[in-house]
């Protein structure tokens, strides 16, 4: 390889396969090998890097290093924009992401860490490398595992609906956390979902309760937690393939574990303690803020939205108080508007409606158990008339109706108008005669 160094090792002096005789040739040989490895690791290595451009496909058949330089400054409308480098190959490849070309050179140098990490890296035939909007440069190395492997690399900048959905989920959890913490549907659905996703973690947690304290088995449990998290991540990455090939087993697992989780949730029941409900509410709201921040690609806009959400949530009652105070001040400053007087027809209609309503309420009270019938009958003059009224008869007798019509009905009104007109005409006649009498007296 370019930049390497060849080390010539002289044969050791003395008997033995390692030359451990006179002169210590074995030790010298080991030192020379180690020094050669160090020189090999620290030597300058030239790396052939291919610069990627957006929406341009780069196809290769051998291991290659790539770099992408982001020159665009993010704007406010890029809050849900994601930049990704897609590597799609016909066979399995190993992809390593680094920050710059210097890190690519370090990957080419020999080290124990690079040697072992190469075996731990996942091999995929279709993967995406996320690039930050504020990242100036991102580099990656694609290593082929088998010969005749053809792969393509492309940079994609697009609107990511997943970021938008994560942001909406955060808004819902933050503003509806108090309602969700008291909802039975949310309680059972969340319990079943956690049971299905984290069944291995729950089993390990239950086993840890039966283990004695200060036991070496905790080392195994810690390893089990890590292994469970790795399995969950692996399943989610290959969920589509698992569903296509093993949908019967996956469906059986979901139904079985979901029923068991529902049974456990049903046994303990929803939260009833107010403090527990408050803790769940705060937890949901904190998760909502985290989702809101992770769902927006521009940090300062995400922080601004979080501050606005906090102010909107916590200043709800002060804002209502200020609004009510403002309305009262405005009403006090306005000139009082005189009330509109009712017309004679409106007054008559309103009187009839209110009278009928009051009579119905009186009948309902008399028929209710709260009314003392004997005490009421002892206080009235006509018990039979009262009984007829309670049964639905009119509260007035025909004689009372005729008297009312004579006094306040249409005939009485006409008579009153005639009397008023006669009195007015008499006053006018007396006024017309007064000037003549005054004039005669003046002449005499």
Swiss-Prot record:
One of its GO terms (biological process) is erythrocyte maturation. One of its GO terms (cellular component) is nuclear inner membrane. The keyword Chloroplast does not apply. It comes from Pongo abelii. Together with EMD, contributes to nuclear envelope stiffness in germ cells. Required for female fertility. Essential for normal erythropoiesis. Required for efficient nuclear envelope opening and enucleation during the late stages of erythroblast maturation. Belongs to the NEMP family. Residues 1-43 form the signal peptide. This is Nuclear envelope integral membrane protein 1. Glycans are attached at residue 125. Phosphorylation may regulate its interaction with RAN-GTP.
């Amino acid at each position: 390889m370019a930049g390497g160094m060849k080390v010539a090792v002289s044969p050791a002096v003395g008997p033995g396969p390692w030359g451990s005789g006179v002169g210590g040739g074995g030790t010298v040989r080991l030192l020379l090998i180690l020094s050669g490895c160090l020189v090999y690791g620290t030597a300058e290595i030239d790396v052939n890097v291919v610069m990627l451009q957006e929406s341009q496909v780069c196809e290769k058949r051998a291991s290659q290093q790539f770099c992408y330089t982001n020159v665009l400054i993010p704007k406010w409308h890029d809050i849900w924009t994601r930049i990704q480098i897609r590597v799609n190959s016909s066979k399995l490849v190993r992809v390593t992401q680094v920050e710059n070309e210097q890190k690519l050179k370090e990957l080419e140098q020999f080290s124990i860490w690079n040697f072992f990490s190469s075996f731990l890296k996942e091999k995929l035939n279709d993967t995406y490398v996320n690039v930050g909007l504020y990242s100036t440069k991102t580099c990656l190395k694609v290593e082929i595992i088998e010969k005749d492997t053809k792969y393509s690399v492309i940079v994609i900048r697009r609107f990511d609906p997943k970021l938008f959905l994560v942001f909406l989920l955060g808004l819902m959890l933050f503003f509806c956390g108090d309602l969700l913490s008291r909802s039975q549907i949310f309680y059972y659905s969340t319990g079943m979902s956690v049971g299905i996703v984290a069944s291995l973690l729950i089993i390990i947690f239950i086993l840890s309760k039966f283990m004695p304290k200060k036991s070496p088995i905790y080392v195994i449990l810690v390893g089990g937690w890590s292994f469970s998290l790795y399995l969950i991540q692996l399943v989610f990455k290959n969920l589509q393939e698992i569903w296509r090939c093993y949908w019967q087993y996956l469906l059986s697992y979901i139904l079985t574990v979901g029923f068991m989780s529902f049974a456990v949730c049903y046994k303990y029941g929803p939260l009833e303690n107010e403090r527990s409900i408050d803790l769940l509410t705060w937890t949901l709201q904190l998760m909502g803020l985290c989702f809101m921040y992770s769902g927006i690609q521009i940090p300062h806009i995400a922080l601004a939205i979080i501050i606005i959400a906090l102010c909107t949530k916590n200043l709800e009652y002060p804002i209502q108080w200020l609004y009510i105070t403002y309305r009262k001040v405005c009403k006090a400053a306005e000139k009082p508007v005189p009330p509109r007087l009712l017309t004679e027809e409106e007054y008559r209609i309103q009187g009839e409606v209110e009278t009928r309503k009051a009579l119905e309420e009186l009948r309902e009270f008399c028929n209710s158990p709260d009314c003392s019938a004997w005490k009421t009958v002892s206080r009235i003059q006509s018990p039979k008339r009262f009984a007829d009224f309670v049964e639905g008869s009119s509260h007035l007798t025909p004689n009372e109706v005729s008297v009312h019509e004579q006094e306040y009905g249409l005939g009485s009104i006409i008579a009153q108008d005639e009397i008023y007109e006669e009195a007015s005409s008499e006053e006018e006649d007396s006024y017309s005669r007064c000037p003549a009498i005054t004039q005669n007296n003046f002449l005499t």
